Amino acid sequence: MDRLRIPKHRAEVELTGPDGEARRFSLFLSEHTSHGGPERVVDLLNGPREFLPAVDCETDATTFLARSCIVIARVAGPLWDVDEVNLPLEHEVEVVLSNGKALSGLISYVLPHESCRVVDYLNDPAPFLALVEGERVALVNKRYVLRVTLR
């Protein structure tokens, strides 16, 4: 049976739910993906699965998280490797959530030249946007975003 299992590794994240409570979880990520490297937390959150298996870092309990109810997932940065061919565009922004909480940081993305405006990035169908907060990255669920303001 072990030969049928997909190899996974754990990634620690700090998740904030709609109630504002932040908790640490370990998510299970695949070692190989279609983009050629290991799966990242952003890949998992922007993927098709609604419930994500995780381990609560405080209680060591196995739990299944409803992806749509994750407001913010904070991970160690950076999100991806930067190379000389695909330098990201970066904009300093303030993201105000529907609960009134404001987050500040950089949105950093690589899009085709013909659709590389901030609004193009925000309207991408992926449910989470990435906000660089110094050494960490906040993956913010767009369902909970009230507005994004350029600074």
Q: Where do the language-model regions lie?
A:
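Conserved RNA-binding domains used in RNP assembly and mRNA/RNA metabolism
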Residues: M1-R151
